[in-house]
Amino acid sequence: SGLFLFVLCEAIAVCDLVAVSVLSGNRNFVGRISPDVRANYLASPPLVEAYALAGSMDIDISKAPIAQTPEGKDVYLKDIWPSQSEIAELVEQTVTREAFIEKYADVFKGDDKWREVETSEGEVYDWPPASTYVQNPPYFRGMGKEPGTIENVENARVLALLGDMVTTDHISPAGSFKETTPAGQYLIERQVPVREFNSYGSRRGNHEVMMRGTFAIFRSKNEMLDGVEGGYSLGPDGQQTSIFDASMAWQERGVPLVVIGGAQYGAGSSRDWAAKGTALLGVKAVIAESFERIHRSNLVGMGVIPFEFTCGDTRTSLGLKGDETVSISGLDTIEPQQEVPCTIVMGDGEVKEITLKCRIDTAIEVEYVEHGGVLHYVLRNLAATPMAAE
């Protein structure tokens, strides 16, 4: 995984090729292996090697040769596939008690590089200002001593209008990214060479990178824009821009944001950054036809309120285009799974009144959102304990 040679990337783009990967891990999301790879197939490690030798997925490796010897003799999968006895013999030779004892004897000491890491002494972490891997996140910035009430969403603009089965990998990709992306530009501005970009996942400790990567997967489609793929939206001036830049522009104007989706919003792995990034982009609510269970919970944990359409309404049936303003009321006295009124002012001025179901599902989740999220809830409770007071 990672970056390809430029000539390969150029050929894929110019010829509109569907590049393919074969991997033995369980992360076969679009763009996870590389932004230039669309199709990803899962296989056992030996099959990964076999397809690497074949150099193509357009082959029946159970019948066709996968390679040739220097003498031109065809090599078939059966010729290189190990027998059960060979596997058993190798396991017996290498998987030993002594090997585990040796590897785990100093597991908590780390290797030489880990022991050479310089650390500062003190009760709190000394955040390195120049680090592009770890930065102090703004979750507690401006936090008061007491929680507030849940505020209504008033005249929010749509940041993204998405379809069905938007996964957490679409929302917060973990793979590599290019220099043309907002995250890439952020690193270039800090003199990080492209070859050292690494991946979103490796830079999850830097919110500046991760919020720029939210909704930025190159194959995603924001239905606000016709025929455009990637993490783009419309800014306050109505012009196409990155979702990150649009978010920052709206936030500078004090305008709240919403994301609108289809069915099974947030499917896939339980990626915390899919909720963190959404919150940092200034999104106050996500309105969808249905939610994946864990992502719904994570949104609530970050103070972002999930809502579901009711009465058969969808983004399509309502004719939403992304140029609407959205207001949701009744949140200051919200109860778990309560239905609340929503006013949508269409781009042409038409007003539509609909009902949404609030997917804050439990009383404790109401408290989380009142606090601004579960992190604020925990911190305030810790600060209120006798031990903290001492």
Task: Identify what each model region corresponds to.
Residues 1-390:
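Fe-S-dependent hydro-lyases/dehydratases of central metabolism
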